[in-house]
Amino acid sequence: MPLSDNLNLLWSSLIVAELVKNGLDTFFISPGNRNAPLISALIHEERSVKKICVDERAAGYRALGHAKAAGRPGVLVCTSGTAPANYYPAVIEAFRDEIPLVILSADRPPELIGSDANQTIVQPDLYGRYCRDSLLIPCPSADYPLEALLARIDSLIARPVGPVHINCAFRDPLVPGIPDSRPIPDELLATAGRLYAREGAYTTYPSPGTLHTGLEDVEAILNRTARGLIVIGRLDGPRDAPALEELAKKLGWPVFCDIASSMKGRIPSDRQIFSLDHPEALRLVSAYAPETILQFGSGLVSKHYFASLLPHSEATVIQISPRAGLRDPAHRVNVRLSMPAFAFVEGLHLQENPSLDATACCLFLDSLETLYQALQRRIPEETLSFSRIASDLLGAVPDGEGLFLGNSLVIRAFDKFRSPFPRKISVISNRGVSGIEGNIATSVGFAEASRRRVTAVIGDISFLHDLNSLLLLAQSATPVVLIIINNGGGRIFERLPIRDFPEILEPYMTTPHGMTFDLLAAQFDLPYFRAATPDELRKAYESALDAERSAVLEVTLDPEEDLRTFQTFQNVRLP
């Protein structure tokens, strides 16, 4: 395959090959110039069956008939303009009858859309509600990760029920043999060659009918793994947590529990990776070099698992999640099992792992423990900081109750620590899109439905976003202890690159307000407490719990002192 001709052909070759690796080997090709890169790739793809179709409308129905007989989709390949529109009747039929169909359309580059360029329409979302899903592939670029391209294709076609649309934009040159204006980087060519030569799909999604086989394959991987790692994100049901406790015992692998997993108090602390956000902890994980990573749940607070650890790891990544869609920001998942965590654990038949490298595991966990104790010693005892608040409250929230964590600095601080002793606390957070509004209302809603008291820890800006929910707080039959960390504004920006631009940082980012919140609590007849030291926080929190009704606890801290503590904390290294 002439991958080196130009980026259009390189991308087209990978797209076509990935479809073939997923079992989609029959292509219904209609002629055109804009889809020439796709046709060129198909000509060189010996594993593909190519059927030439003059009329796209008839091609659509031909592919529909193929899918009805073969039980898997045919792939329709066309140029831009009215060509993909001619598939519409067949697309509607496929949608209503749940027949798998893949449309692979070429498109003009975005700068030509809406410019009166010839043979150009707005092709994204062309089929509207009659398309199960769609993927917009941008013009080929050396800066776009090829792994992301393949992972998105695999995710799109993993559930073959109804039509899906892959729309590929291309700039010139559209034909093979003509190079781009800039040579393709050697590193990109090497990556493309490696991905093209892979025997199977980049990410495999065993279907419900083949989950048993998928589990057997995973069992084999687990049983031959010497150094493994379990990563637990937000879980989906009450049966998941005890199942993962049991799995962690059986495997004997180190475990990272995201704070939102509610698992920090359920996995023994001497088996836990306390943080993936601390540079030295991340270095230790990388040096441990896990061969297999089992990833449960969705989302992680720390971006470094996806941004720093996975891209440089050679581990086989197995993701277990019942949620639909691509959930892989690093585009590194090798096997995706669409099932609840508890069902995965129940379906496994694990034996004692003869391959486990217990020595490497113990050395790794011992180093983590040494680092954790060093970090604890660096947190000032007499002054408040996010680190001190998080460390203390993780041991103070009563067992069996709820802990709501606001976004921004709050949840990141709690994610860096482990529970000091075993406990079952339900951690609640709004991490879907990580907004800072509605935090108080969410806490009240959880407390009312679960009939369990909730301690809600939020920042001052989050509090100001949801002032009207103080009425809900006051009226809640189940108490919510609202802890507001008042550091005078949105101080997370002082830890981001924008800090180097003071003319932007303040007031535009940090939005300082100079307020305290005692009078607001009084307005709603809520008990109010204030703390400015660790000792005051402990006493005030105990008093708020003793009130046995909703209460407000305002914690004031010096943002400059807190920033110094954070910087000292992050700079700790092992000898």
UniProtKB/Swiss-Prot annotation:
The answer to whether keyword Transit peptide applies is no
**Reactions accelerated catalytically:** isochorismate + 2-oxoglutarate + H(+) = 5-enolpyruvoyl-6-hydroxy-2-succinyl-cyclohex-3-ene-1-carboxylate + CO2
Q: How is the cofactor bound?
A: Binds 1 thiamine pyrophosphate per subunit.
The Gene Ontology terms for molecular function here are: 2-succinyl-5-enolpyruvyl-6-hydroxy-3-cyclohexene-1-carboxylic-acid synthase activity; magnesium ion binding; manganese ion binding; thiamine pyrophosphate binding
According to its UniProt record, which cofactors does this protein need? Mg(2+); Mn(2+); thiamine diphosphate
Pfam families referenced in this protein's UniProt entry, alphabetically: TPP_enzyme_C, TPP_enzyme_M_2, TPP_enzyme_N
Choose any GO biological process term that the UniProt entry carries and state it: menaquinone biosynthetic process
Entry's EC annotation:
2.2.1.9
Protein's UniProt keywords contain Cell wall biogenesis/degradation: no
The alphabetical list of record keywords is:
Magnesium, Manganese, Menaquinone biosynthesis, Metal-binding, Thiamine pyrophosphate, Transferase
Q: Which InterPro entries match?
A: DHS-like_NAD/FAD-binding_dom (IPR029035), MenaQ_synth_MenD (IPR004433), MenD_middle (IPR032264), THDP-binding (IPR029061), Thiamin_PyroP_enz_TPP-bd_dom (IPR012001), TPP_enzyme_TPP-bd (IPR011766)
Pathway given in the UniProt record: Quinol/quinone metabolism; 1,4-dihydroxy-2-naphthoate biosynthesis; 1,4-dihydroxy-2-naphthoate from chorismate: step 2/7; Quinol/quinone metabolism; menaquinone biosynthesis
Could you list the residue ranges that cross the membrane?
none
> What task does this protein carry out?
Catalyzes the thiamine diphosphate-dependent decarboxylation of 2-oxoglutarate and the subsequent addition of the resulting succinic semialdehyde-thiamine pyrophosphate anion to isochorismate to yield 2-succinyl-5-enolpyruvyl-6-hydroxy-3-cyclohexene-1-carboxylate (SEPHCHC).
Q: Name the protein family.
A: Belongs to the TPP enzyme family. MenD subfamily.
**NCBIfam families, A to Z:** menD
Task: Fill in the subunit field for this protein.
Answer: Homodimer.
**Protein's name according to its UniProt entry:** 2-succinyl-5-enolpyruvyl-6-hydroxy-3-cyclohexene-1-carboxylate synthase
Species per Swiss-Prot/TrEMBL record: Syntrophus aciditrophicus (strain SB)
